[in-house]
Amino acid sequence: MAKSTTFFISLTLPFLLLSVVTATYYQSMSPTVLGFQEEKFTHLHFYFHDVVTGPKPSMVIVAEPNGKAKNSLPFGTVVAMDDPLTVGPESDSKLVGKAQGIYTSISQEEMGLMMVMTMAFSDGEFNGSTLSILARNMIMSEPVREMAIVGGTGAFRFARGYAQAKFYSVDFTKGDAIVEYDIFVFHY
């Protein structure tokens, strides 16, 4: 009997100690403890200007594959961007922020991108706030592309939602594009 009790204690004691140690690094809490009130739902609408041409391009290719290319963004191309976000499609329209990040050409068969970008807002109610997108963007095969909003900062803390993107205008020869964005996001 003593041997089985000793065995049982030696088997359960590490689990008990582990559960005590594990429980010390987190706690469940209500969002109101951090000052978060009722969750909000926001719709944003703006235009994204991806400009290759001119004296001050907003995107640059930082890596590209060797060999012949079938299109302007062959598989494996990596692009860095600092694209203006504006109220209207015109380049001189009111600036509301920047889309900053990278995208990579991810498909050998069709024009597809992996977008890793932060939309940093610089005007109005959301000045200083950001939304982060991490998503596949099949720019040629889907007229309206849907991308995941995976987080945010400032007014968009705990953000989750999706972005819909569609070409407003695109010049495939030069590489310049204006993309219309509709963003639907839950946040506190």
Swiss-Prot record:
InterPro entries reported in the protein's UniProt record: Allene_oxi_cyc_Dirigent, Dirigent
Q: How does activity depend on pH?
A: Optimum pH is 6.5-7.5.
Key word Cell cycle present:
no
Catalysis performed (reactions): a (4R)-4,2'-dihydroxyisoflavan = a pterocarpan + H2O; (3R,4R)-7,2'-dihydroxy-4'-methoxyisoflavanol = (-)-medicarpin + H2O; (3S,4R)-7,2'-dihydroxy-4'-methoxyisoflavanol = (+)-medicarpin + H2O; (3R,4R)-3-(6-hydroxy-1,3-benzodioxol-5-yl)-3,4-dihydro-2H-chromene-4,7-diol = (-)-maackiain + H2O
Where found in the cell?
A: Secreted, Extracellular space, Apoplast
EC number(s) given by UniProt = 4.2.1.139
Q: Which GO terms describe its cellular component?
A: apoplast
UniProtKB keywords:
Apoplast, Glycoprotein, Lyase, Plant defense, Secreted, Signal
Sugar-modified residues: N127
Q: Has the keyword Plastid been applied to this entry?
A: no
**What is the protein's quaternary organization?**
Homodimer.
Q: Which PANTHER family does this one have?
A: NUCLEOPORIN-RELATED
What role does this protein play? Involved in pterocarpan phytoalexin biosynthesis. Catalyzes the last step in the biosynthesis of the phytoalexin medicarpin, and thereby contributes to plant defense reactions. Dirigent proteins impart stereoselectivity on the phenoxy radical-coupling reaction, yielding optically active lignans from two molecules of coniferyl alcohol in the biosynthesis of lignans, flavonolignans, and alkaloids and thus plays a central role in plant secondary metabolism.
Q: What is this protein called?
A: Pterocarpan synthase 1
